Amino acid sequence: MKTRFPSPFFIFYRRLTVAISLGKILGWGCFGKLLSWIFAATVSFRRKVLSSAPHRVSSTVISVGNIVLGGSGKTPTVLWLAEVLKARGYSCAILSRGYKGKCSGQRKLTIVDPEIHDAAYVGDEPLLMAGKLSKGAVFVHKDRRLAAKEVAKNFDILLLDDGFQNNKLHKDVEIVVVNGQDPLGGGAFFPRGRLRDSPKRLQEADFIIVNGSCGLENQKLLHTWCTSPKIFVEPRISQVLWDSRGEKLPLDSLSGLAAGVFCGLGFPQGFLDMLKRAGVKIVGTYLLPDHAGITKKELHYFSSMTAMRQGEGILCTEKDGIKLGNLIHEPGILPIGKVQMEFDFTHQEDATAALLDKIDRIHNGKR
């Protein structure tokens, strides 16, 4: 007999994979230490043994990356850079691997077009960025060295999304984004923690962008590992898109709203805390692995659970919403609001000016 809800086994599987990805399972005991050591050794081997001389291109290459598994804020940083550099007269292209997208396994260059592509093909983050930038500015290729060789002919600046671990392409400016609440991903490699790279490598960054509230202890911890200039930013909600109702509402529309929240993020707590600060009464959550999309059955299940708890709607990140496709208009589902977020660089004028001046100097030196 068919049911519109997922099986209990599938729900258990979802919860298990989320717990593993957040370092809550497999992280303890000798087995967890062994897995973490293997992960760290593999990372070190790939970097030291498989590295080759990085390829240089005529464009200025700016890398935006992190040292943890997801959830640091790379996408808002890339979008901010693309906007401010365009305002300074530069033509910018974004190079992405298209993680989790079908085209990421193909050795060909894909120009992301929101009118013809979906998240399943190009990946959620490239599709999200392409929808906010000029047409033809976001490119996906499995090998970004090859992509850069082709794209550099037509652009002043190449923004390398998630590029810190890429050693095939020479990078003129290295930016690393860290989460202010947990800058070192629990201080251990996956699965004991969320590290995907050694904190020692932070010293290689030209600038560190600290996303969100960063207490004095975490600031001292960061300074212990690197003395690179730091830019402190605050994530903020700009508006909420209710596609099924055709509405775009401001931040204050969330105050007092009873809603269920689903998201597939590397650090979901940051998003949940932001909604609480905005006045949302969260009546239930449904967490997904990073980059995973919610299924039709899961959406029906979570909508029903939210309605039973007197929820008025469902909220998700814009990145999660872009994977919904036609599910946003699925009959029998509570209204879904896609929360748009951006970084607030207020009071960081000196730090951001130093970053942009460095980019100017490097680019002018290449002419």
UniProtKB/Swiss-Prot annotation:
Pfam families: LpxK. GO terms for biological process: lipid A biosynthetic process; lipopolysaccharide core region biosynthetic process. Pathway: Glycolipid biosynthesis; lipid IV(A) biosynthesis; lipid IV(A) from (3R)-3-hydroxytetradecanoyl-[acyl-carrier-protein] and UDP-N-acetyl-alpha-D-glucosamine: step 6/6. Belongs to the LpxK family. It comes from Chlamydia abortus (strain DSM 27085 / S26/3). This is Tetraacyldisaccharide 4'-kinase. The gene is lpxK. Its EC number is 2.7.1.130. Transfers the gamma-phosphate of ATP to the 4'-position of a tetraacyldisaccharide 1-phosphate intermediate (termed DS-1-P) to form tetraacyldisaccharide 1,4'-bis-phosphate (lipid IVA). One of its GO terms (molecular function) is ATP binding. It comes from the Bacteria. PANTHER family: TETRAACYLDISACCHARIDE 4'-KINASE, TETRAACYLDISACCHARIDE 4'-KINASE, MITOCHONDRIAL-RELATED. The keyword Nucleotidyltransferase does not apply. ATP binds at residues 68-75.
